[in-house]
Amino acid sequence: MMEVLLRLLVTQVILLALATSFVSCYDPNPLQDFCVAASETNRVFVNGKFCKDPKSVTANDFSYSGLNIARNTTNFLGSNVTTVDVNKIPGLNTLGVSLARLDFAQGGQNPPHIHPRATEILVVTKGKLLVGFVSSNQDNNRLFYKVLKRGDVFVFPIGLIHFQMNVRRTRAVAFAGFGSQNPGTIRIADAVFGSNPSIPQEVLAKAFQLDVKLVRFLHIVFGPPLW
């Protein structure tokens, strides 16, 4: 009986050791688009941000004011996103969370985009929003969408294309939480047709089955200003 118990104990210790080694060897999630290994010690960037001396930390490092203020939505999208991430609240560093306020004019939208480093959870506090996300190619690019009213919540899985659009004739407001201190944002149209330098027109024309002249026009619309 004692021999059986001893074997069980040894097995548990081995499994615990293996689990601990897996945890300690796991790479941290990226906190920016890329982190290239640096050979020059005087030009070192870390995955995230360096830590401030704890003795010099104050309450101001953990706070942000003004998220109650409505933002200007007089732009071609009719929306404004106010992000509160580690760049606004230094105390968020290493904590893995951030948030944003989304303001929408009548018919305004937050166009199809992705957050490469975070899942998003959104709650509507004013108006009605049509929201949705598209699953991956493996899942046949299914669209999951819903109209949200005040108090409704919706989740957008990490890395999937999603959008929000105001479907009422009044302003709409929502707040979003992210599972990263720096979730990142890639607006699909801006990235594809406004990259710098531009993706070759022939590539986009074939990929989207468009005329090269239309691709050239879209490069002008979404590309950097010409003046």
Swiss-Prot record:
Give the keywords, sorted: Apoplast, Disulfide bond, Glycoprotein, Manganese, Metal-binding, Secreted, Signal
Here the disulfide bonds are: 35-51
The record's subcellular locations are:
Secreted, Extracellular space, Apoplast
Indicate which residues are glycosylated according to the record: 72, 80
Protein residues bound to Mn(2+): 113, 115, 120, 162
Q: Which Pfam families match?
A: Cupin_1 (PF00190)
Assigned GO CC terms: apoplast
Q: Which InterPro entries match?
A: Cupin_1, Germin, Germin_Mn-BS, RmlC-like_jellyroll, RmlC_Cupin_sf
Residues of the Cupin type-1 domain: 65-216
Signal peptide stretch: 1-25
Q: List the SUPFAM superfamilies hit by this protein, alphabetically.
A: RmlC-like cupins
GO molecular-function term, one example from the UniProt record: manganese ion binding
Entry's family note: Belongs to the germin family.
- Relate the assembly described in the record: Oligomer (believed to be a pentamer but probably hexamer).
Q: What does this protein do?
A: May play a role in plant defense. Probably has no oxalate oxidase activity even if the active site is conserved.
User: Which named protein is this?
Assistant: Germin-like protein subfamily 1 member 6
Q: Which organism is it from?
A: Arabidopsis thaliana
